[in-house]
Regions:
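Conserved, structured core segments of small domains
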Residues: 1-102
Length: 102
C-alpha cells in the first residue's frame, strides 16, 4: 500500500516562542525532538525542523504514513502537542525516496 504524505506545521503558542521559551517550554521542546528522532531515522518523517522566520518561527515536518490514524497517533503522542498546535495538510509527494507521486 502506498504511503500517504502530509505537511505538518507546528504553531507555537506565541510569535516570540523561538526566542523566549521558558525553561519548562525548552524541556517540552527537547522531548518533542527526542520523540520524533526515531521516526526520522526509520523514514516515516522525511523532513523535520524549525523555520526561523523573524516574524515568528514555527516547525514543519513532511511525513509518510500508512493511514491517517497512524498520523493522528503520532501527533497525539508528541510531547509538544498541546503547548503548540498542529496544522495538517495532505500532500501529493515525490522525491528520490518515494517511488511515485502518492
Amino acid at each position: 500500500m502506498a504511503k500517504q504524505h502530509f505537511y505538518l506545521k507546528l504553531n507555537p503558542p506565541r510569535a516570540s516562542f523561538t526566542f523566549d521559551m521558558t525553561n519548562d517550554e525548552k524541556l517540552v521542546m527537547q522531548h518533542h525532538v527526542s520523540y520524533w528522532k526515531p521516526y526520522v531515522e526509520n523514514g516515516i518523517v522525511l523532513v523535520l525542523g524549525p523555520v526561523l522566520d523573524p516574524k515568528g518561527g514555527f516547525g514543519i515536518a513532511v511525513i509518510g504514513v500508512d493511514d491517517e490514524m497512524q498520523l493522528e497517533t503520532l501527533i497525539a503522542n508528541d510531547p509538544a502537542n498541546g503547548l503548540n498546535s498542529y496544522e495538517i495538510y495532505p500532500m501529493k509527494a515525490t522525491s528520490k525516496f518515494i517511488n511515485s507521486i502518492s
